[in-house]
Regions:
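Structural motif
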Residues: 11, 146-153
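Active-site-proximal, Lys/Arg-enriched surface segment
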Residues: 1-25
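Active-site beta-loop-alpha junctions of metal-dependent nucleic acid enzymes
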Residues: 35-61
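Short, structured patches in soluble enzyme cores that scaffold and shape functional sites
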Residues: 21, 25-27, 35-38, 97, ...
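Generic alpha-helical structural context detector
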Residues: 49-52, 134, 161
Length: 166
């Protein structure tokens, strides 16, 4: 059986056929990037796609900014691919370590390396993303997700974001 095309963002989940909305939000509740994926897709594999979509216009002349200064993310984004990706691009991050990763590191002893830095006060600011998703889901079209294709769901999300910005 052929794989489902990327623009068909429907995926199986506990609730049936669903899609997920991945957002990048700045400190002022502005959405920098929105990506729609199938419901069963993991968070970590989609992280780079979300980061690539970030475009912030500069006040002066020049190309838009594509690299944030700092990234806050939950445990789902704690993976061996994401931390080096952020380090290579020079982006500071606050991502809690998964419990099983910490256990493996501790079990390996000195060979396990140092734990990644984690700032609890900085992590508390992550609630802005959750609040923005809640605000986005106040729109009936986004909350009910009647759209069958990811491209239509993306359009619904974009229209809702524009309407809320006005």
């Amino acid at each position: 059986m052929a794989a489902e095309p990327d623009n068909h963002g429907l995926g199986r989940s506990r609730g049936g056929l669903t899609t997920k909305i991945r957002l990048a939000v700045d400190a002022s509740f502005h959405v920098l990037a929105a990506v729609i994926t199938a419901g069963q897709r993991g968070d970590a594999p989609v992280f780079e796609r979300v980061m690539e979509k970030i475009r912030v216009p500069r006040v002066s002349v020049g190309h838009p900014r594509t690299r944030p200064k700092h990234v806050l993310a939950d445990r789902a984004y704690s993976s061996l691919q994401i931390r080096p990706f952020l380090r290579k691009r020079g982006i500071a991050h606050t991502i809690p370590e998964k419990r099983d990763q910490a256990g493996h590191r501790i079990r390996r002893g000195a060979a396990g390396g140092r734990p990644p830095g984690f700032d609890r006060e900085m992590y508390k600011r992550r609630h802005k993303v959750e609040c923005r998703i809640g605000l986005l889901k106040q729109a009936r079209g986004v909350a009910t997700r009647y759209d069958k294709l990811a491209v239509r769901c993306q359009a619904t999300v974009q229209l809702t974001l524009i309407r809320q910005a006005l």
